[in-house]
Amino acid sequence: VLNGGGTPVGVVSSEKRANLLREMGCEHVIDRRERDYKFWKDEHTQDEAEWRRLGKDIRSLIGRDVDTVFEHPGRSTFGASVFAAARGGKIVTCAATSGYMIEYDNRHLWMKLKSIVSSHFANYKEAWAANQLVCDGKIQPLLSKTFSLEQTGEAALAVHKNQIEGK
């Protein structure tokens, strides 16, 4: 985002991750747990007031809504992500570690001309360009832990439990 001229706002689930983003150059970071967002009142009912609070917190940092939201957790945060995107903005979904049966208020999508797109990283040309950024030292990939092939189950469980940063 920084290399593309954008203003990133990182929304994370711990102070450790907030510090990691700051070390990587992200000036605007919100720790969901510190702010105690409760996007769900119960397992069936989302809390739009909490979405509004997140949007207000984002606007207090950068003065506007965000153009693009990279949505990773899935069920637990998707409604808030749809709400937080600016009019005409995009929500890019690239995973669903908190659940893949997604719910959101569609009025916040269609009434504000937002779109949802999916991504599974990149096509070959985009992957080459991303690798070139690494080779040129413009971005630093984050690898928090490595696993052997025999530890695939353990690795998947660590992702599910939100214990991994980066890839």
Predicted regions and their residues:
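Glycine/Thr-rich phosphate-binding loops of Rossmann-like dinucleotide-binding domains
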Residues: 39, 78-79, 101-102
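Active-site loop of short-chain dehydrogenase/reductase
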Residues: 65, 87-91, 165
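Conserved helix-to-beta-strand junction in the class I
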Residues: 83-85
